């Protein structure tokens, strides 16, 4: 059977934790940051787990993760 291809766009956006969960970056921290408070920007800096409803889709895009 041939190798499965990884979706490169997904590979750049998601990482796997040691326990097999997927981690993502939060949105709204790229530009237009002047009016956002420092507390909010700090909160957006932290990583977030992928929602359980999306895990199956992400794992199909990353067959070797």
From Swiss-Prot:
<keyword id="KW-0687">Ribonucleoprotein</keyword>
<comment type="similarity">
    <text>Belongs to the bacterial ribosomal protein bL35 family.</text>
</comment>
<keyword id="KW-0689">Ribosomal protein</keyword>
<dbReference type="GO" id="GO:0006412">
    <property type="term" value="P:translation"/>
</dbReference>
<protein>
    <recommendedName>
        <fullName>Large ribosomal subunit protein bL35</fullName>
    </recommendedName>
</protein>
<dbReference type="GO" id="GO:0022625">
    <property type="term" value="C:cytosolic large ribosomal subunit"/>
</dbReference>
<dbReference type="InterPro" id="IPR018265">
    <property type="entry name" value="Ribosomal_bL35_CS"/>
</dbReference>
<dbReference type="InterPro" id="IPR021137">
    <property type="entry name" value="Ribosomal_bL35-like"/>
</dbReference>
<dbReference type="InterPro" id="IPR001706">
    <property type="entry name" value="Ribosomal_bL35"/>
</dbReference>
<dbReference type="InterPro" id="IPR037229">
    <property type="entry name" value="Ribosomal_bL35_sf"/>
</dbReference>
<dbReference type="Pfam" id="PF01632">
    <property type="entry name" value="Ribosomal_L35p"/>
</dbReference>
<dbReference type="GO" id="GO:0003735">
    <property type="term" value="F:structural constituent of ribosome"/>
</dbReference>
């Amino acid at each position: 059977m041939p190798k499965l291809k990884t979706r490169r766009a997904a590979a750049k956006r998601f990482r796997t934790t040691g326990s097999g969960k997927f981690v993502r970056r939060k949105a709204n921290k790229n530009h237009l940051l002047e009016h956002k408070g420092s507390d909010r920007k700090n909160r957006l800096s932290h990583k977030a787990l992928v929602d359980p409803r999306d895990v199956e889709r992400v794992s199909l895009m990353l067959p070797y993760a």
